[in-house]
Regions:
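Hydrophobic anchor at the beta1->P-loop junction of P-loop NTPases
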Residues: 471
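Extended, folded cores of ATP/NTP-driven motor/assembly subunits in large transport
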Residues: 1-433
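Short beta-strand-centered segment that lines the nucleotide-binding/catalytic pocket of NTP-utilizing
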Residues: 495-507, 522
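Walker A (P-loop) phosphate-binding loop of P-loop NTPases
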Residues: 476
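P-loop NTPase motor domains
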Residues: 48, 55-71, 293-300, 387-388, ...
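A short helix-turn-beta junction within AAA+ P-loop NTPase domains corresponding to the substrate/partner-engaging
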Residues: 515-518, 714-727
């Protein structure tokens, strides 16, 4: 006989999907409430980039986290979530400049085409506090039995189920919320100097919960419609259970749980998880036990193993008084377990804590075959760490629902773990993506690069208010190419750009952006200089005094002015401004400077270098993109020094112009070691690095010779003044000099030594370093390249189509093929 009640019973017990979610609603802007009376907060944890840390730094970071996690004692559930997903958000703003927009648009298309193979890593913590009312409800239910039998029965039932609503008092909830908030704030403060942890608001938590139960972007998007019924609102996908996988919306889900813990934990024990190119969620749950309960659990297991190590038959068949203990067969494995448990007791006595720990991995994609392959890869990681994973089948729904905060009653895969081991397995280390916004300029990032793990890295030169940058690399490592790339991306800020070039590396880029390229070499001069054309200000008079002192004393200061000569020089400079402007020339100046006339003879029209400064007019002017080519003066330092000094002063006046205070400025010294050989120029550069921050200016020094910086005494100064350092390939570097000058550890030195040109670099900012790859699109390449063959093509296309359209046509006709990053697997889940 067919009994309908038996047929529909499983359907009734399965209930609606939201019935399996223990979330109830939002209590405050940052606190959520569960149906069982628990309160919780969700934290966005930026993490620490592990790539450049040595072993001691890794251990220090873990110890800091271990100490901070002690804020959460018995009654807390600490959930940690590691999200890795493809198609990261890479924002690109729109720009009015057609050339800038052409470059940005091509960069946008370049990354859009490869978004399926790019990933992002996110870390979240959820701190859940079990409600105080739920822990004392049995006694309360018995106490109210005679005055309210129905309510008492309902309350009594609610204590033994996790998905039934409980009647809670506001005072109890408020008390729990205050305690939770205090503990979370203590946790955040302990790590405040380490990383900036964000407590998610209502919208952030809603999106987080939806991401746990939905895998399509359109299903995750949305806002909470009410502060209640959160279980109903976050579920936005159907779930179908198959024998060995789930179907959630349009995705196939595989759930793996940790069956055996890693035998010996250490920092970055599971770092291989970060390197797998796949979409997944890794979730851990940690529930600290009270000290007395922890000891009780350990002793219970010690007694069990002690009783079972000799076997029941051996114990019954031997007389304990007459039998030698050495004659009894002992299970050595059980004895080892007893000793390990004894070590655990000693650890508890030393202040460590024991807790329930579980780890769940959720793989998602659209191909079951790919997920099967990934499952094997994940299992291999744990096997190599002496642990093991179990692929869930009949328990997969429980395991999947258990990743939602508050669903701890469904978590059936728990292991005991010490807090020190838990800290090692915590999600602390990550792959930092840089900063998407430049907080100082209030704009988007400077440029997008890529990491070894196929994640985007958003580069900003600024560290706070300072953007001075040092670029170091051997010949052929790509310094000029990188500098061109950085300058072309910086044009999105509409800056004043000044470049001191040697050899014409930036001539093409200057033309592309409509700048002025002036040759200041011996063979060609595009401007004339008259130092006395400067307005009569205190700063300019002081500069002229230093300038003529350089002319008189010569390179290496072969002649030194005495006190009387210094006074005579100053008086002569002041008297020059009594003459008519047309009479203010170097030749006339020598007539009133007295005995110093002979020292200045070679700088007059009748002398060797009179063409440089002895001119009636000064035609030197600055455009928004200004490049000076000093090619040809490398072998004449006595001329290069005053020429640089004058042009540098004029550029500095442009930078310090109060009318341009709101404009960002970039000053690039290519082959900087040639420019700072002279003490006067060095002092000027040092002073500029100290003061240009106030004028919203950044100085970029590109050089291949660290030896020249060291011998000139500039190495320590530049290392301190340039908070951003970009190291390109240099396998023959002096490791000890690099270590001492830039405070690099062995890991960072190894990374620099292993860089492959062109394109690979190590970017060091503040106390962190990141190895990245410069993979350019075709337009960026054609803007940055500067060899003769490419320059001829650019000249032809620019004449035919204009600059903006010419770049687009070059990219279409001669596409550039960027370097392809190697990944551990060829399959990618969408």
């Amino acid at each position: 006989m067919l009994r309908l009640d038996k047929v529909i019973k499983p359907w009734k017990e399965s209930a609606a999907l939201n019935d399996h979610i223990n979330l109830y609603g939002f209590w405050t802007e940052t606190t959520f409430l569960t149906k069982s009376g628990d309160v919780g907060m969700v934290l966005n944890v930026p993490g620490v980039d592990y790539e450049s840390l040595d072993r001691s730094e890794q251990e220090y970071a873990v110890k800091r986290l271990e100490a901070a996690l002690k804020s959460f004692g018995p009654g807390f559930h600490v959930y940690q979530y590691l999200f890795k997903s493809n198609r990261p958000d890479i924002p690109f703003a729109k720009y009015d400049d057609p050339i800038v927009e052409a470059a940005i648009d091509q960069r946008r298309k370049f990354f859009e085409a490869k978004r399926d193979h790019l990933y992002q890593v996110e870390i979240f913590y959820c701190i859940l506090l079990e409600g105080a009312r739920s822990k004392t409800g049995v006694a309360a239910a018995l106490a109210r039995f005679f005055r309210d039998p129905a309510g008492a029965v309902g309350e009594f039932k609610a204590q033994f189920t996790n998905d039934s609503m409980k009647t809670l008092l506001r005072s109890h909830i408020e008390h729990d919320v205050r305690r939770l908030d205090q503990c979370v704030q203590a946790f955040v403060r302990q790590l405040a100097d380490f990383m900036q942890i964000e407590v998610l608001d209502r919208q952030g938590q809603f999106t987080f919960f939806r991401r746990l139960l939905n895998f399509d972007d359109w299903r995750v998007a949305g806002k909470p419609q009410s502060t209640q019924f959160l279980d109903y609102q976050v579920v936005n996908s159907n779930i179908e259970a198959e024998r060995d996988h789930l179907r959630v919306g349009d995705h196939i889900i595989r759930v793996l749980t940790m069956k055996e813990a890693v035998t010996e934990t250490r920092p970055l024990a599971l770092d291989a998880l970060l390197k797998i190119p796949a979409n997944f969620r890794v979730v851990t749950e940690w529930t600290p036990l009270a000290a007395d309960k922890a000891r009780k659990e350990v002793n219970k297991r010690r007694r069990h193993f002690n009783m079972s190590k000799t076997g029941f038959v051996s114990q019954m068949g031997n007389d304990a008084t007459n039998t030698n203990p050495r004659d009894v067969l002992v299970d050595e494995s059980k004895q080892a377990d007893i000793e390990n448990l004894g070590d655990c007791l000693r650890a508890l006595g030393d202040g460590q804590s024991l807790g329930d720990f579980s780890l769940t991995i959720v793989l998602y994609g659209r191909s079951k075959a790919e997920l099967d392959q990934l499952g094997t890869e994940f299992a291999g990681i744990f096997t190599n760490a002496d642990g093991s994973l179990f692929s869930e089948t009949y328990n997969q729904l429980n395991a999947y629902f258990a990743i939602v905060p508050g669903n701890y009653a469904l978590n059936l895969r728990k292991l005991f773990l010490l807090n020190t081991n838990y800290a090692d397995l915590s999600f602390l280390f990550t792959i930092l993506p840089g900063e998407k916004t430049n907080t100082f300029l209030g704009t988007e990032y400077l440029a997008v690069l890529e990491t070894d793990n196929s994640t985007p890295y958003f580069l900003n030169l600024h560290n706070g208010e300072v953007a001075h940058t040092l670029i170091l690399g051997m010949t052929g490592s790509g310094k000029s190419y990188l500098a061109n790339f950085l300058l072309q991306n910086a044009q999105k800020y509409a800056p004043l750009t000044f470049i001191f070039d040697i050899g014409g590396s930036f001539q093409s880029l200057t033309r592309i952006f409509g700048g002025s390229y002036l040759n200041a070499g011996q063979e060609s001069r595009d401007f004339t200089i008259n130092p006395f054309s400067l307005p009569q200000t205190k700063e300019n008079l002081q500069f002229l005094f230093s300038f003529f002192r350089v002319l008189i004393e010569g390179n290496g200061q072969r002649y030194r002015l005495d006190f009387k000569e210094e006074r005579r020089l100053w008086d002569a400079i002041e008297r020059m401004y009594m003459l008519e402007p047309t009479q203010r020339t170097v030749s006339n100046f020598t007539n009133i400077v007295g005995e110093l006339k002979e020292r200045l003879h070679r700088w007059t029209r009748g002398g060797q270098y009179g063409f440089l400064f002895d001119n009636a007019e000064d035609t030197l002017s600055f455009s928004r993109f200004q490049t000076f080519n000093f090619h040809g003066w490398n072998d004449a330092p006595e001329v290069l020094e005053p020429l640089l000094f004058y042009v540098l002063h004029r550029a500095s006046n442009e930078i310090a112009d109060p009318a341009k205070l709101a404009t960002f400025k970039i000053f690039l010294l290519d082959e900087a070691w040639l420019f700072i050989k002279n003490e006067t120029i060095r002092n000027y550069v040092v002073q500029a690095q100290k003061t240009w921050r106030k004028h919203k200016a950044a100085m970029i020094l590109a050089t291949q010779s660290i030896k020249e910086l060291e011998e000139s005494g500039m190495l320590a100064i530049v290392a301190e003044s340039c908070p951003t350092k970009i190291f390109l390939a240099n396998p023959e570097m002096n490791r000890e000099v690099y270590r001492e000058a830039f405070h690099l550890n062995d890991t960072e030195l190894d990374l620099i030594g292993g860089l492959v040109p062109p394109g690979q670099m190590l970017i060091r900012k503040a106390q962190t370093s990141k190895k990245v790859h410069l993979n350019v699109d075709s337009v960026s390449h054609w803007m940055a390249t500067n060899n003769a063959r490419d320059n001829m093509k650019k000249r032809d296309y620019f004449e035919r189509f204009g600059i903006a359209d010419g770049l687009r046509h070059l990219a279409e006709d001669y596409p550039f093929q960027p370097r392809t990053l190697a990944t551990s697997t060829s399959n990618t889940n969408h």
